[in-house]
């Protein structure tokens, strides 16, 4: 059910935000872009970024603490999304995350760079791109969950070594 008091509070906060934007000369637009809205909410609550672990339990990324559960009153209850942010953490017989926003994995690089580390992987010559490439895994520091795999161009001495090796192995068709 919708609580009229909460809806009035939301409306008042919205009005205050529009006033602040106007006062600072920022043009406000109304967006229906769910990803942009979701990212904004998640970025504001990033300290309570939680990752699903098992048996409906979550781990907080910031400090690695365990045993968070989605509150039964939450719209995400029973869904067990991989990542959520919580506006409230309440403790009763369990520790519950309330007022949650689901977070998409692809948002994490943008909204939570402070929680991400890099691990270099293989370096190779990419024939199609005609470049030396290094794969780099991006992962969450506390849980080591992979967030993304980036391919970056390698330059300098290391690129020369890989290129020469590819030439010697006839991986490069070099016209004379």
Kindly label every feature range from the protein language model:
Residues 1-67, 80-176:
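Acidic, serine/threonine- and proline-rich low-complexity intrinsically disordered segments
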């Amino acid at each position: 059910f919708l609580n009229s008091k909460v809806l009035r509070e939301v409306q008042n906060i919205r009005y205050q935000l529009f006033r602040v934007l106007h006062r600072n000369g920022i043009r406000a637009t109304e967006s229906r872009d769910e990803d942009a809205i979701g990212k904004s909410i998640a970025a504001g609550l990033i300290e309570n970024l939680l990752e699903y672990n098992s048996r409906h339990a979550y781990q907080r990324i910031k400090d690695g603490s365990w045993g968070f559960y989605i509150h039964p009153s939450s719209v995400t209850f029973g869904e067990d999304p991989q990542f959520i942010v919580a506006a409230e953490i309440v403790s009763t017989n369990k520790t519950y995350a309330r007022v949650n926003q689901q977070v998409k994995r692809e948002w994490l690089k943008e909204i939570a760079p402070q929680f991400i580390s890099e691990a270099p992987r293989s370096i190779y010559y990419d024939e199609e791109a005609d470049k030396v490439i290094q794969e780099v895994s991006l992962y969450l520091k506390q849980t080591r969950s992979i967030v993304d795999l980036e391919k970056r161009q390698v330059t300098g001495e290391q690129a020369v070594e890989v290129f020469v090796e590819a030439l010697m192995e006839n991986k490069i068709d070099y016209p004379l």
